[in-house]
Amino acid sequence: MKHKVGILGGTFDPPHLAHLRMAEEAKKQLGLEKILFLPNKIPPHKHISGMASNDERVEMLQLMIEGIDSFEIDTRELMRAGKSYTYDTMRDMISEQPDTDFYFIIGGDMVEYLPKWYHIDDLVKMVTFVGVNRPSYQTEVPYDIVKINMPETTISSTEIRNNIENASTFLPEKVWSYIKEHQLYGKK
């Protein structure tokens, strides 16, 4: 019997409660054994002052999932030289773990962009895409996507960074403490 592992990719700048809820709901609704959080590189053209470094983002993720045995972090995309595509990452993971079915979890806001993903026609044969239903987003694409439901949330990392003074309710307590301690996103 194959293992069932969820992958939740993102910049996680910062990781917040909606990321945690997405992972929890996917694990519960799909019967996944574990969830791998896959932090992405921030493209050089997006790396502006006020954004957290790779190490800071990984540290915040570790704080967020601390004590949850079925949640882990995979940093391979941060370590890869050059461009990092989901296709390459999943090809490597499947090669390393041929006894595993991977479920790639994406927010409802990302589903409509799937046709633009690198090697998407091959990628949809390699993994099961899981779209987190959000009423405000179009989730119809020409690919089979497993849909899971999650209560509507308006939390986004961008909004948190832009309004850091009022962000504590959207962040795990340890992540909020880390942001204050390290004065990230302008938090003094």
From Swiss-Prot:
Group of enzyme by EC: transferase
Family to which the UniProt record says this protein belongs: Belongs to the NadD family.
Catalytic activity as recorded in UniProt: nicotinate beta-D-ribonucleotide + ATP + H(+) = deamido-NAD(+) + diphosphate
Pathway(s) of this molecule: Cofactor biosynthesis; NAD(+) biosynthesis; deamido-NAD(+) from nicotinate D-ribonucleotide: step 1/1
InterPro entries: Cyt_trans-like (IPR004821), NadD/NMNAT (IPR005248), Rossmann-like_a/b/a_fold (IPR014729)
Lineage: Bacteria, Bacillati, Bacillota, Bacilli, Bacillales
Xref: SUPFAM superfamilies: Nucleotidylyl transferase
E.C. number: 2.7.7.18
GO molecular function per UniProt: ATP binding; nicotinate-nucleotide adenylyltransferase activity
Protein name per its UniProtKB record: Probable nicotinate-nucleotide adenylyltransferase
Role noted for this protein: Catalyzes the reversible adenylation of nicotinate mononucleotide (NaMN) to nicotinic acid adenine dinucleotide (NaAD).
UniProt-listed GO biological process terms: NAD biosynthetic process
Pfam families the UniProt entry points to: CTP_transf_like
Keywords of this entry: ATP-binding, NAD, Nucleotide-binding, Nucleotidyltransferase, Pyridine nucleotide biosynthesis, Transferase
